[in-house]
Amino acid sequence: MEEEVFSASAPAERIASLVDNGSLTGAAQHGTLHIASGTIEARQVNVIATNRHAAGGSLGVIEAKAISAILEQSSAAHHAVILCLDSAGARLDEGLAALGAFRQLYRHMLDSRLAGLPTLALIGRHCFGGASMLATTCSQRVYSDASRLAMSGPAVIQALGGSGELDANDAFAVTLLMGGAARTRMSPADHLCDDTHADFRRAARNWIVDVAAAPALDLRQQHTRLGKRLLAHGMAPSPPTNARDDLPAVLQEILPPGIELHTMDGVLFGRSKSSPNAFFGLIEGNPVGALTVWTLAGECLAVGDQRPGEAVTIFLDCPGQAPTFRDELVMLSEYVSHLALVLASLRRNGHRVTLQLLGDAAGGIYVALAAPAARVLALPGANVQILPPAAIARVLRRRSASTDVEDYMRAGVVDTLI
């Protein structure tokens, strides 16, 4: 087993290769997901492994519930968690049910991370969509040269942006953009190893030995680091400007009178003069990139720092994350998970966080806003999708099924219909 390829192994084999000999217990399978417990250097760990052969995403309803349960158990017992991720994210053919289940799973992941649960992501070959959000929420990530991590996979980037954005069949270009070596250069918490059982096991053992001395998550430091990355890639923030007058009528009805609204890098923001309420919006109808996500996270951090207990309402009308070379170059997944962590931190510190869906909502942007929210409200005209329709058609080779607004409630992607 020493020289076998880690990423090519079955989920159960990957789990067994990581833990101390004779320590494996509680091995179980939930859908396509494998879970077991064991020790690494005599320290108790729970290990989760996805199945890379699951078509259209390996994180369905069953798998999401199983991971949520393990995170809860691990937090209660103070046992570290290792996620062996090789997945395109939420299972597309389960539609909204998978999206709703992933929303709940990601909420557990955010709360576990903020509570200090040690989490390690071992990246197999493909880690896209929701799986990449799980990975970038973890304390640390380990890649090999065979690893690929991105918010949007190569096929989705090409489907939505054309081959001029990225040729999904150009292995060199894909590796240069989202391969393990490229990703480890982005973050000081990430490591690169050989794609063998021995090297991944060594990385897991080094992590578990050092985990007690690892610094606590500092969202402000993380925000500063991500901002420097944007600047290094030519994405400088713009100064705020007054919001346009022709805001959607439904938004004008909701917002309190006299509020001063501004926009900055695609983010609408303003504060009520009559009550402790902050309002933000991603409502321009365009896919959201790293700079916009970072800007919103910064405004929300300011609420937490300067205005304790202030309620936060976010309005959403956008078709999801930006499937662009430029945004994946800076590792969009890390920006999306950072925003989600900031919002979850606000909720945990007494801020009421509400998401209101005005129009389109899809993919990782929806999850990053909905998972930490106390409530998600859907206004007339809301359209929730697991991915933009063109991306679903590219992956599944068929159109997504039509849905009724009542399906949103049943699936758990919305809490209240207005």
Describe the function of each predicted region:
Residues 88-216, 324-418:
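Conserved catalytic cores of soluble enzyme domains
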Residues 38-51, 65-92, 278-281, 295-326:
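A structural preference for short, pocket-lining loop segments at secondary-structure junctions
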Residues 53-60, 121, 355:
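Active-site mouth loops of central-metabolism enzymes
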